[in-house]
A protein has these predicted regions:
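Short, charge-rich binding segments
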Residues: 80-85, 105-107
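Helix-start/capping segments and mature chain N-termini
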Residues: 1-74, 102-177
Length: 177
């Protein structure tokens, strides 16, 4: 493991992540306490869920304790980016993607684990105020036996159309029937 400056990455065009969506991710935050200490919210739980998602997509598993320790080191290096204004935090996006260069669909033996970060405020423009939600009747996000429980890019890509529809109608989010 190594911590390097943010930048582009180079991948073989045949990498499974491009052709079969072999990718999972998580999202968590580092924040400052009132006394200035930097903390993260439940990183081990996020990494356990990430491993569950990876298992569903046949991506390699990783050691949760090691991942938490690496993330702590990353946050320590980047601690100056953790804001101290109320309602703000450093958003951490760990992700794991299949890098096998093969057009055949199979379990993945080679993967890359990365973390990127950015400063964020509230997820919704309205902050902590209630939001209006569209009840989506046409598109579905998950089916029995599918990947709905996994945090994988395909689930979110498939939800984009409903999200755009909701935004055009003035809603902040979508609830699927």
């Amino acid at each position: 493991p190594r911590i390097v400056p943010f930048g582009d990455i180079s991948l073989n065009p045949g990498a499974l992540v491009f052709h079969y969506g072999a990718e999972v991710f998580e999202g968590l935050k580092a924040y400052r306490t009132p006394n200035g200490e930097v903390q993260m919210f439940r990183p081990a739980e996020n990494f356990k869920r990430m491993n569950n998602s990876a298992e569903r997509l046949c991506l390699p598993q990783f050691d949760v304790d090691d991942a938490v320790e690496y993330l702590r080191k990353f946050v320590e290096v980047e601690k100056d980016w953790v804001p101290d204004q109320y309602g703000t935090s450093l958003y951490l996006r760990p992700f794991l993607f299949g890098t096998d260069a093969d057009l055949a669909l199979h379990g993945i033996s080679h993967a890359t684990f990365m973390v990127i970060a950015c400063v964020v405020g509230s997820y919704y423009k309205s902050g902590l105020a209630p939001v209006d939600m569209l009840i989506e009747m046409d598109d579905v996000r998950a089916v029995r036996g599918g990947t709905g429980y996994a945090k994988c890019g395909g689930n979110y890509a498939a939800a984009t159309r409903a999200g755009e529809k909701a935004a055009k109608k003035g809603y902040s989010q979508v609830v699927y029937e």
